[in-house]
Curated annotation (Swiss-Prot):
Name of the protein: Mediator of RNA polymerase II transcription subunit 18
Keyword Transcription regulation: yes
General remark: Present with 1011 molecules/cell in log phase SD medium.
Gene Ontology BP terms: cellular response to heat; positive regulation of transcription by RNA polymerase II; positive regulation of transcription elongation by RNA polymerase II; positive regulation of transcription initiation by RNA polymerase II; RNA polymerase II preinitiation complex assembly; termination of RNA polymerase II transcription; transcription open complex formation at RNA polymerase II promoter
Biased composition (Polar residues): 117-126
Keywords, in A-Z order: Activator, Nucleus, Transcription, Transcription regulation
Family matches, as InterPro entries: Mediator_Med18
Physiological role: Component of the Mediator complex, a coactivator involved in the regulated transcription of nearly all RNA polymerase II-dependent genes. Mediator functions as a bridge to convey information from gene-specific regulatory proteins to the basal RNA polymerase II transcription machinery. The Mediator complex, having a compact conformation in its free form, is recruited to promoters by direct interactions with regulatory proteins and serves for the assembly of a functional preinitiation complex with RNA polymerase II and the general transcription factors.
Region (Disordered), start-end ranges: 117-162
Known partners and oligomeric status: Component of the Mediator complex, which is composed of at least 21 subunits that form three structurally distinct submodules. The Mediator head module contains MED6, MED8, MED11, SRB4/MED17, SRB5/MED18, ROX3/MED19, SRB2/MED20 and SRB6/MED22, the middle module contains MED1, MED4, NUT1/MED5, MED7, CSE2/MED9, NUT2/MED10, SRB7/MED21 and SOH1/MED31, and the tail module contains MED2, PGD1/MED3, RGR1/MED14, GAL11/MED15 and SIN4/MED16. The head and the middle modules interact directly with RNA polymerase II, whereas the elongated tail module interacts with gene-specific regulatory proteins.
Main location: nucleus
Length: 307
């Protein structure tokens, strides 16, 4: 369990390249491309559960978020085949269109490998050409983040994905004078589940939870001093009726630091200072602010929100 201190901001699509250069200069580190498929689960409404704890205190039921990385081969189409998988590829995701669909995510949840065709059409000559070009670029600019590359798996499979991460979060701390958002988060890793035809879906159903909604995040991360992490991301809500990009026309920026102990006041104050220094450094370019705490409330009584 950690205390996560954070600030949020946004930029338009046209400011992406400049922000990448700025954050690279500030952090001294290259951006790392990542993705995360997030599924949100709520208590099964057909179960009658007493919402009280061992002290007979009323406890509101919370949602649980499960997230994992999926192979990038599930996320790119034919128009991106010849592009290296680095931070530049994010500029190609400008609309709602994305190969990952509702049926594929259902297969992932039920531990079935989704059927993808985009990488099957890639020939070996194209791969060799791309790697040769990347090698030349890397040798020419060994310290330049522009040439940082990350290859997707040529043979996508569900088994190659990272394990599921299970997260439960509290509503951020209240207070009108807070300079940063502070939220308690408990997280663990699901390495495996037992039983016949086991899957994360059957595991959650066994715990008394049912699927509610899901979304996909694709972005880049910067690792900075003082344990500060910056995420620049695009978000899609994935529904049976189709996908929709929530961040259409721009990017969401999240700056956060995790503090391992909520009672470590000195560390919390130090972390808050680090975030405020970043806010001051980016002032006039990006306005980092504290979001509405209701938008980060995972309690079931507060509607379908992204957490």
């Amino acid at each position: 369990m950690v205390q996560q201190l954070s600030l949020f901001g946004s930029i338009g699509d046209d400011g992406y390249d400049l922000l990448i250069s700025t954050l690279t200069t500030i952090s001294g580190n290259p951006p790392l491309l990542y993705n995360s498929l997030c599924t949100v689960w709520k208590p099964n409404p057909s179960y009658d559960v007493e919402n009280v704890n061992s002290r007979n205190q009323l406890v509101e039921p919370n949602r649980i978020k499960l997230s994992k990385e999926v192979p990038f081969s599930y996320l790119i189409d034919e128009t991106m085949m010849d592009k290296p998988l680095n931070f530049r590829i994010l500029k190609s995701f400008t609309n709602d269109k994305i190969p990952l669909n509702y049926a594929m995510t259902r297969n992932i949840l039920h531990n079935t490998v989704p059927q993808v065709t985009n990488f099957n059409s890639t020939n070996e000559d194209q791969n060799n050409s791309k790697h040769t070009e990347d090698t030349v670029n890397e040798s020419r600019n060994s310290d330049d983040i522009i040439d940082v590359d990350m290859d997707a798996s040529p043979a996508p499979s569900n088994e190659s994905c990272s394990p599921w991460s299970l997260q439960i979060s509290d509503i951020p701390a209240a207070g009108n004078n807070r300079s940063v958002s502070m939220q308690t988060i408990a997280e663990t890793i699901i390495l495996s589940s037992a039983g016949k035809n086991s899957s994360v879906s059957s595991l959650m159903n066994g715990l008394g939870y049912v699927f509610e909604f899901q979304y996909l995040t694709i972005g880049v991360k910067f690792f900075m001093k003082h344990g500060l992490i910056l995420e620049l991301q695009k978000i899609w809500q994935i529904e049976e009726a189709g996908n929709s990009q929530i961040t259409s026309g721009g990017f969401l920026l999240k700056a956060y630091i995790n503090v391992s102990r909520g009672t470590d006041i000195d560390r919390i104050n130090y972390t808050e200072t680090a975030l405020m220094n970043l806010k001051k450094e980016l002032q006039g370019y990006i306005e980092l602010s504290v979001p509405d705490r209701q938008s980060m409330d995972s309690r079931v009584a507060h509607g379908n929100i992204l957490i």
